[in-house]
Amino acid sequence: EFRRVLFRSIPEDVKVQVLIQCREHLIKRTFEAIQGCKNVIIHIYNSTSTLQRDVVFNMDREEIKQIAVDGTKMVKKYMEGFDGNIQLQYSPESFTGTELDFALDICEAVKEVWQPTVENPIIFNLPATVEMTTPNVYADQIEWMSRHFTDRDKIVLSIHPHNDRGCGVAASELALLAGADRIEGTLFGNGERTGNVDVLNIAYNMFSQGINPELDIENVNEIIDVYERCTKMDIDPRDRKS
């Protein structure tokens, strides 16, 4: 019932995004959950970093790539019975700990299976799952990926910065300059460990430079009220939005 109320409340031009591991029973259950939703981003991911390949999965590159390919095929399988519009998003989790050539290879393999179009591009999300470097290094990685993707016009290059080094906003802005098209973040930076990049902070920064962030940032007091009531967390009194 909650799901139905939620879907009825979502404007038609807003996409619901669901995050799923590349595991069939989770993908199947997710498609059952989103029935009735008109526009959905199916976001699949798997770990790709050198450390996770060796320590967590004990798999080589080809085996890790096959997980992503199989996950993409499963999404295509279950979307056949779905009435709404689907856009695929894929994340090589722990991108910042992954060799760039392998990150590119696995994304290209997913794209080959999915066959995106200019009208319905695939989203490749390149997360700083752990912020491991200075912002300029992350921006260099984003630029390299943007330059080396094939069919770049069929790709939305997304970033997902965490804030382990306290540089999430700087990393986001430099990544946008380096070729990123989209940012994933959270309200007031709320996220695991030291949090994710604050989307409102990014929006205010863009607005101050004469760029329309395409977010309604005028009603921030109500946003704060809902946030604090739902999370039981307070906005820092020195935050410029408080």
Task: Give the role of each language-model region.
Residues 19, 43-47, 160:
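Short beta-strand segments
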Residues 9, 24-155, 173, 177-178:
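Alpha/beta enzyme core
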Residues 26, 164-170:
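Short glycine/serine/threonine-rich phosphate/pyrophosphate-binding segments
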Residues 191-216:
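C-terminal helical cap(s) of enzyme catalytic domains, especially alpha/beta-barrels
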Residues 1-6:
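Short, small-residue-biased leader/transition segments that mark boundaries at the very start
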Residues 178-195:
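Glycine-rich phosphate-binding active-site loops on the catalytic face of alpha/beta enzymes
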Residues 210-241:
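A mid-to-C-terminal "edge-of-domain" accessory segment
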